[in-house]
Regions:
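Gram-negative (and chloroplast) outer-membrane scaffold detector with strong preference
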Residues: 61-135, 203-216
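Predominantly the C-terminal beta-signal and adjacent terminal strand-loop region
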Residues: 78-82, 94, 161-247
Length: 247
């Protein structure tokens, strides 16, 4: 019975070497999931935006064992903005946003590789397409200014197995974009309309992403680590067999 118990414990310990979730230089990390954007505007902003979400995809390349560079993009989605003084139902425009971003990431190396926290700092480029004026501004020419802004990131992967992890990612940015409205005489205001209206966005959104993560090891280093693991596993098994024989 004692021999059987020792053998079972040893088998579990050697099986713990069956996969390697540690990240190293040359590895690729792919993430895909859904991102929720929580708009946050400054108090003096005249416009607001409803919360929305979109599918997103990113990939990271590990330049060192701890430092990686990530590129993220999402599927374009239509977004509505409204006049804050008139409420969410008072939509004044809609547009489609493309906001790819790149971040430099630092991956911490905890002893428990099943939990991989990281932080990041990067840039987000926002361009806007198919702008359309709505409501009281219908008929006018509505345009949003492109912007390049800093973005801050934190998150973690929770490892399910060697290839797949669950990911939570949070990003914070402050956009420098603004909006302008011209040709206001074409709206219901007619000849009494001002020549131009400018809006400062003052938006400081927070994004929260829930993702699946796939880890792809550097083939050469993966073979080296696998060979080392096999040698260690073999050594452990020999020690276990010797311990059983000595009982």
């Amino acid at each position: 019975m004692n021999k059987l118990l020792i053998f079972f414990v040893a088998l579990l310990s050697t099986n713990s070497w069956g996969y390697n979730s540690e990240i190293n230089k040359g590895d690729w990390i792919l993430r895909s999931g859904y991102t929720f954007l929580l708009p946050q505007f400054s108090n003096d902003s005249q416009i607001g935006m409803a919360r929305f979400g979109m599918p997103t995809f990113s990939f990271s390349y590990l330049m060192t064992d701890n430092i990686g560079i990530e590129f993220l993009t999402g599927l374009p989605s239509e977004i509505d903005i409204y006049n804050k003084s008139m409420g969410e139902e008072a939509k004044i425009a809609s547009f489609i946003s493309l906001s790819p971003n790149a971040t430099m990431q630092y991956y911490f190396k905890p002893k428990n590789y099943d939990f991989r926290p990281y932080v990041g700092l990067g840039l987000i480029y926002s361009s806007f397409h198919k702008e359309k004026s709505l409501g009281i501004l219908s008929g006018a020419n509505f345009k949003l200014k492109k912007s390049l802004d800093p973005i801050f990131q934190t998150g973690f992967d929770y490892v399910v197995n060697e290839k797949i992890s669950l990911n939570l990612d949070v990003r914070k940015l402050k956009t420098s974009s603004g909006a302008s409205v011209t040709e206001l005489h074409k709206t219901i205001m007619g000849p009494y309309a001002p020549q131009r209206i400018d809006y400062e966005m003052g938006m400081q959104p927070l994004t929260v992403s829930l993702n699946f993560t796939w880890l792809f090891h550097n083939p050469k280093k993966f073979r080296e680590r696998r060979s080392l693991q096999e040698r260690v596993t073999l050594k452990q098994k020999r020690k276990t067999i010797k311990a059983i024989r000595d009982i």
